């Protein structure tokens, strides 16, 4: 779908210079002399490079709609992660580096959303929060309750995060998969 350069908004995916780009920041600029333009900071969906580009209102760009499909994580085989399409039951193999450091949070049966462009995977979204067990945590020191302090802990998947002093090894907690931070203790519903 063609749109004018001044209609590009953050989150839009556009085709530019033969690649797919997602608009990160958009700034409408109206200089004292000359025509107005849209200053767009974009990130390449394939290799992650950034680009700043000016689009005049008269320019048109191709806005791309990505298809989003739910997949279920099945298992890991070496560096390959195997997912199954929830509707067609076809399997999809993605490399671990495609998912990034969040791959450590994948659990058997977890539902993820994969963004596809012309049947090719472009991005993946994990649930925002997951329940994990702490395998190692430093003991709480007396007197640490006065100030808001955190201590290091190691999760069952090997990721290191900071947790409040009252959290101990063996407890289940909720972790934000985007920021890799402690959210809260897990309760029975979260397991």
From Swiss-Prot:
A Pfam family the protein falls into: EFP_N
Keywords tagged on the record: Cytoplasm, Elongation factor, Protein biosynthesis
Gene Ontology molecular function, alphabetical: translation elongation factor activity
Record flagged with keyword Protein biosynthesis: yes
Domain of life: Bacteria
Family: Belongs to the elongation factor P family.
Function of the protein: Involved in peptide bond synthesis. Stimulates efficient translation and peptide-bond synthesis on native or reconstituted 70S ribosomes in vitro. Probably functions indirectly by altering the affinity of the ribosome for aminoacyl-tRNA, thus increasing their reactivity as acceptors for peptidyl transferase.
Compartments (UniProt record): Cytoplasm
Native source organism of the sequence: Bartonella henselae (strain ATCC 49882 / DSM 28221 / CCUG 30454 / Houston 1) (Rochalimaea henselae)
Sequence intervals crossing the membrane: none
Ion transport in keyword set: no
Pathway named in the protein's UniProt entry: Protein biosynthesis; polypeptide chain elongation
Any single Gene Ontology cellular-component annotation: cytoplasm
GO BP terms in the entry: peptide biosynthetic process
Name of protein: Elongation factor P
């Amino acid at each position: 779908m063609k749109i004018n350069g001044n209609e590009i908004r953050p989150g839009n995916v556009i085709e530019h210079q033969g690649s797919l780009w997602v608009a990160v920041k958009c700034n409408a600029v109206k200089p004292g002399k000359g025509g107005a333009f849209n200053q767009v900071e974009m990130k390449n969906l394939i290799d992650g490079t950034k680009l700043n580009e000016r689009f005049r209102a008269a320019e048109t760009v191709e806005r791309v709609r990505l298809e989003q499909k739910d997949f279920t994580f099945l298992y890991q085989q070496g560096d390959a992660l195997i997912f199954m399409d929830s509707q067609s039951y076809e399997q999809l193999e993605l490399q671990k580096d495609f998912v990034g450091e969040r791959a450590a949070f994948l659990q058997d049966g977890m539902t993820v959303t994969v963004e596809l462009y012309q049947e090719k995977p472009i991005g993946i979204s994990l649930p925002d929060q997951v329940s994990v067990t702490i395998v190692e945590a430093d003991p709480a020191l007396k007197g640490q309750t006065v100030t808001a302090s955190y201590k290091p802990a190691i999760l069952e998947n090997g990721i290191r995060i900071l947790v409040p002093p009252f959290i101990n090894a063996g407890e289940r907690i909720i972790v934000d998969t985007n920021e890799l931070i402690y959210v809260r203790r897990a309760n029975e519903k979260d397991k």
